[in-house]
């Protein structure tokens, strides 16, 4: 009986703690007057290698990672940066077609960290390179939680200098990871806009 009461109390405590939204957005800006010449930007597919092996894990609580998180976050970031209007942003289809014409994989170009080559192939002044640490849904029978944790850096393709970077980490109860990612990317770009202007 005492064991059952203990389990009930523990379950309630876990649910109460789990209902809290955790949110953190960090922006770092490293622009100087010579960086004002950056006019065109391309967002590369986010590196989602860290979450690819996490398709489904856990016994009681299942964590399901989205299989195309890298492309989804690149699309979201492209859309939000385009809405900002500060840069001319290449669409993801433009990025893909220019890279395909160069007969190389997008992931390989990003991994090589050859930003000058990316700039020449895409004909852009800067690229946004992102990495995903979490992008999924943790699910129990009576409880679900969306998780998004990623970083992004805007890198000058001529100098190799990081112009700005962002780190976002959010976890919210009963929130789909895609909806949560849209919200987080929008908030991060809004915060970036305030820091830059």
Q: How should each PLM-predicted stretch be described?
A:
Residues 8-16:
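Bacterial N-terminal signal peptides
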Residues 37-42, 85, 123-128, 144-151, ...:
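Envelope-exposed proteins and targeting segments
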Residues 1-6:
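Bacterial N-terminal signal peptides that target proteins for export
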Residues 52-53, 99, 137-141:
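Extracytoplasmic/secreted cell-surface and envelope-processing proteins
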Residues 62, 145-151, 155-197:
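Short secondary-structure boundary motifs at beta->alpha junctions and helix caps
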Residues 69, 73, 77, 111-115, ...:
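Stable alpha-helical elements in mature extracytoplasmic
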Residues 19-96, 192-197:
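A structural "domain/chain start" motif
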Residues 84-129, 133-136:
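Short, solvent-exposed, polar/charged sequence segments at loop or secondary-structure edges
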């Amino acid at each position: 009986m005492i064991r059952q009461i203990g389990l009930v109390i523990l379950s309630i405590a876990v649910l109460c703690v789990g209902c809290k939204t955790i949110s953190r957005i960090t922006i770092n800006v490293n622009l100087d007057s010579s960086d004002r010449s950056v006019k065109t930007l391309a967002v590369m597919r986010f590196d989602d290698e860290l979450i690819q092996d996490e398709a489904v894990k856990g016994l009681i609580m299942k964590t399901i990672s989205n299989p195309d998180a890298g492309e989804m976050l690149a699309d979201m970031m492209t859309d939000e940066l385009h809405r900002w209007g500060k840069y001319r942003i290449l669409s993801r289809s433009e990025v893909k077609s220019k890279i395909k014409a160069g007969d190389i994989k997008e992931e390989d170009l990003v991994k090589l960290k050859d930003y000058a080559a990316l700039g020449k192939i895409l004909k852009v002044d800067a690229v946004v390179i992102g990495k995903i640490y979490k992008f999924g849904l943790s699910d129990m029978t009576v409880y679900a939680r969306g998780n998004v944790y990623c970083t992004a850096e805007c890198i000058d393709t001529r100098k190799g200098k990081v112009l700005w970077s962002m780190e976002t980490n959010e976890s919210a109860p009963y929130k789909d990871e895609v909806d949560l990612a849209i919200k987080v990317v929008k908030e991060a770009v809004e915060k970036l806009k305030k820091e830059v202007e």
